[in-house]
Design a protein with these regions (language model features):
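Feature for exported/extracytoplasmic and membrane-associated proteins, marking the mature portion
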Residues: 2-331, 335-342, 387-456
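Generic beta-strand/beta-sheet core signal
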Residues: 307-310, 352-354, 379
Length: 456
């Protein structure tokens, strides 16, 4: 292999590629105490696809009846999607836009839609919202709403995400229970074991191009020597950081060895100017990791994966960009589900979407403002598909006033289902948690009558 000189920038980039979640330092310092729950012999995985920026779900799932569509078009105006392009969903009055594979999955009972879900402390009415009663803090803020979705708590700031807390409650908690293929995220932050984070491909050190094939000392040995000096430091944080880096090296080597036996998939979906790591590449990596889950250290029986599709903050050019993103998401989800099915793991792997928030129903030019409630997709063999769960608000206007008690004066939609209800339903399938354990993961769940939505 051709060797090359490593400069300071290269070294820092490599260090970043090795990094696990920063919660690993806290874990090494003993910040958390383990909790125990049931042990499992079967395998299950949850795959979260976070639609970052705020997906306009009311242009993803649209009424198809004459009256329903006319009301929708009256509110949405120039950003409404054409009725003749809607793909009907069986036994409903709604259709999907630009997502033919998802329509096919829904009609084959392999995909469910969760209607009007969002961050809530408890159920609230429009009157309460307008009066500022029981509203989640910092509504319509990207970073705050993302964090509330990822912590599953809209009442107070959390120190860890819901996936980290869910993993803590597993008896067979594993170093590879939580895996992100798009870098750091709060959903998997703060657990007793840090999330394993990947940005791009996994390489053993001798594949980075920095080792000299004629040298007796490999690059990873040199890096070990550098870190060893930090291990011998008297400073507790320096020692913890060094231990973390050594652990990361071992993790990378273990995963890269397992990946030598991974099944090959060929995800071909593309999206022009897609920011960040392409979702197709992320989900292809997840499929490969799932194919070798039994070969990872500890053979994890439960895994939560995090992927992210960027670019949903459509303040402009929504009618051009949003349909492309929906179709791309449709294609990649189909490719991923085909890969899972080919491994005969459809019943064991459940994929679901989440987003910062929905968008305002009323356009602001050629785009939309930040909203609140939106719709989510859940697919997999264990899903009770072919149904819409939850409640759609009525999209009717009389004399300039919205008649639905869930549409605010500014045209935003108050969620009728909480993110905690949605995520708790997924978690119940994933971990068979007791009611008391679900309360640890989802602190506001008892504020809602329906704790399990029954879609899985």
């Amino acid at each position: 292999m051709k060797s090359k000189t490593m400069n300071r920038r290269d070294f820092l980039k490599l260090q970043a590629s090795l990094a696990l979640s920063s919660s690993s330092l806290l874990s090494l310092l003993g910040a958390f105490s383990p909790l125990q729950a049931a042990s499992f012999s079967d395998y299950k995985a949850l795959v979260c696809i976070f639609l970052e920026g705020g997906n306009d779900a009311f242009n993803m799932v649209v009424p198809t009846t004459t009256t329903g569509y006319d009301d929708y078009k009256l509110i949405r105006g120039d950003i409404s999607v054409p009725k003749d392009e809607l793909l009907p969903l069986k036994n409903t009055d709604y259709g999907l836009y630009n997502m033919p594979a998802m329509q096919e999955m829904f009609n084959a009972d392999k995909l469910a839609i969760i209607a009007n879900v969002g961050t809530l402390v408890r159920p609230i009415t429009k009157i309460e919202f307008e009066a500022g009663i029981a509203n989640p803090p910092q509504l319509f803020s990207h970073i705050d709403q993302q964090k509330q979705w990822m912590s599953a708590n809209s009442n107070r700031l959390e120190k860890s995400g819901w996936a980290a807390k869910a993993a803590n409650l597993l008896e067979n908690l594993n170093d590879f229970t939580n895996i992100s293929v798009d870098g750091s995220n709060f959903m998997q932050f703060g657990g007793d074991k840090p999330a394993f984070e990947i940005s791009g491909d996994i390489h053993p050190f001798n594949n980075y191009g920095y080792s000299d094939p004629d040298s007796k000392i490999s690059f990873d040995e040199i890096l070990h020597q550098i870190i060893q000096r930090e291990v011998e430091s008297d400073h507790i944080l320096i020692k913890a950081y060094a231990d973390n880096q050594i652990q990361n090296i071992a993790y990378r080597e273990s995963v890269s060895q397992a990946m030598e036996n991974a099944l090959e998939f060929n995800f071909t979906s593309t999206l022009d100017d897609e920011p960040g790591i392409p979702l197709a590449k992320q989900l292809e990596m997840i499929a490969k990791l799932i194919s070798v889950h039994a070969q990872l250290p500890g053979s994890p029986k439960r895994q939560i994966f995090f992927a992210r599709l960027h670019g949903f903050d459509h303040h402009d050019l929504q009618t051009i960009d949003h349909p492309l993103k929906l179709n791309y998401l449709n294609n990649v989800l189909q490719e991923f589900q085909d890969a899972i099915t080919s491994m005969q793991l459809s019943d064991q792997v459940t994929t679901f979407t989440a987003s910062d928030f929905g968008r305002s129903l009323v356009p602001n030019g050629n785009g939309t403002d930040h909203g609140w409630g939106g719709h989510a997709l859940v697919m997999g063999g264990a899903v009770k598909g072919g149904q819409i769960y939850g409640e759609f608000p009525e999209l009717t206007v009389v004399s300039g006033e919205y008649t639905s008690e869930y549409i605010t004066n500014s045209g935003r939609v108050i969620p009728t289902t909480s993110a905690e209800q949605y995520l708790a339903t997924l978690a119940s399938w994933f971990g068979s948690y007791s009611d008391s354990e679900l309360e640890i993961i989802f602190p506001n769940l008892n504020n809602f009558n329906e704790k399990n939505l029954g879609f899985i």
